[in-house]
């Protein structure tokens, strides 16, 4: 069907005007048309697109909110790792960082810095192809994140199409999605009216919103987005300040309170000013991000295993507020650690309602001499974990008694043990309900087996009914058994059975993390799973074998070794293997396309995610050749952290340098 020219022109006119109005409203905060006019124009565009679907384009304002996502979010690898930042908690630590970077590049002069407010939200990585938004991904572990593109498209301060002539093939943008405080309050008010659980703080609400399976819900919550990093091949951009200006010109909302500081002395003043003024903002911040402005100097400084050397997050001091202790209870964790907790009158700390705070251990309880009825000062350590800082003895009521740590586990009544040299008291009964409960919840957690629907309440019901006495029991549960549990039913039971079946496809590193071995976090689990391709290899490794792996120290090595010496743990592994869980690394896929045929590579330094042997294997499978030294025959030098003389030689010979991300793109080409 031929579309009349005047209809085509009107459609484009409406799109342009609505995009301009949206930018003025959500980015510039300076609307030029009333909402009623916007709605009228929007409906007109909708009507045209319904009659002529050929006119629908990905950047149309009508295409921001899509249909429900059919299944779980897909994990994708970041093209460029999304590093977290090193933290400094005072000006002394800021100055130490300044001295460190100067020593690293052998400089004695200070430099120019860009200061930006550290927004308390969720980091996102956006990819634009030929100017159009094609992907929005969560930070995840920095290497891989979840593809939440349908939800990202609903955020009005993220342009669907870049405001740029002749856009590059690829543009990467990083920034923070967040909820303004008034929006957060409104959401919690609505949830309270519906008798739904309240969000603890705006950061949690933003993260939870982004993982919604229905973009319409995300759209209603009106998330905002501040852009702060631009990855774009443009020789005209030489510093971070220019990057931020370019992001603004492309149509992004960039925090207006950024400042260019000629020295760390001015950085300190900026930090102190905003520490005082931060509560005047319409959103939460938890510090200041300091970046070296010069991009060439950033490149020279590079990255550590975790952080960029050219940036640091200067956190605000924790807020401290008084409250009254109503009770002191004992919490038993999944590792058996017994932690005293203060139950208090509810109080707001750093934007969150706090009713409990950790007392850490028996030594800390004795040091504080904390008692029920005491008025205490609490704060959030790193603005995350509430803790009791001190008591106010002058406000202590009469006839209080010192708190006594129990000698038996409050959950199973087994004698508690305090290992020599440790501050933590432990329950060592592997059948303790609290340890089992914590272990199963950990097994089902997002970074482990990610079993949707298996939260703490369901776990408690399964344990109380005697259906689960070990993690392995999860995989022999019947739908009818689950359906009989309180508030479950047939549909929920089927969903849970399906989620547990899907968990059998999770990787060996996730399974290893899910086992809950002391000191083995998700990152350590990945390192171990890469070094030991099967559980048998890991179980048979000596402490020396384990400790020799980069990133695995003596403490972790001893813990892993000891865990596999316990018969009950070996039995658990055997049962989980029999249930079909993955206890071996997946076979590495081969590349059939010889995309690197005839090319010679040299690898130098430590790569962000690949071991050198893994990078070599990928190159060779793609038809390339890897040599140990740079010569005129070298086509590419693959650069990692701490590149040495090979880089100097490559620069001298004019050899092309590649990052790990660029190498992977070359292989895929």
UniProtKB/Swiss-Prot annotation:
Enzyme class: ligase
Keyword annotations from UniProtKB, A to Z: DNA damage, DNA repair, DNA replication, Ligase, Magnesium, Manganese, Metal-binding, NAD, Zinc
Binding site for NAD(+): 35-39, 84-85, 116, 139, 176, 291, 315
Reported cofactor(s): Mg(2+); Mn(2+)
Keyword Manganese: yes
Keyword DNA damage annotated: yes
Residue ranges annotated for the BRCT domain, each copy included: 591-669
Gene Ontology terms describing biological process: DNA repair; DNA replication
Active site: 118
Enzyme Commission identifier(s): 6.5.1.2
One example GO MF annotation: DNA ligase (NAD+) activity
Catalysed reactions listed for this entry: NAD(+) + (deoxyribonucleotide)n-3'-hydroxyl + 5'-phospho-(deoxyribonucleotide)m = (deoxyribonucleotide)n+m + AMP + beta-nicotinamide D-nucleotide
A Pfam family of this chain: DNA_ligase_aden
Residue positions binding Zn(2+): 409, 412, 427, 432
UniProt family annotation: Belongs to the NAD-dependent DNA ligase family. LigA subfamily.
Function according to Swiss-Prot or TrEMBL: DNA ligase that catalyzes the formation of phosphodiester linkages between 5'-phosphoryl and 3'-hydroxyl groups in double-stranded DNA using NAD as a coenzyme and as the energy source for the reaction. It is essential for DNA replication and repair of damaged DNA.
Full protein name: DNA ligase
Organism encoding this protein: Microcystis aeruginosa (strain NIES-843 / IAM M-2473)
Taxonomic path: Bacteria, Bacillati, Cyanobacteriota, Cyanophyceae, Oscillatoriophycideae
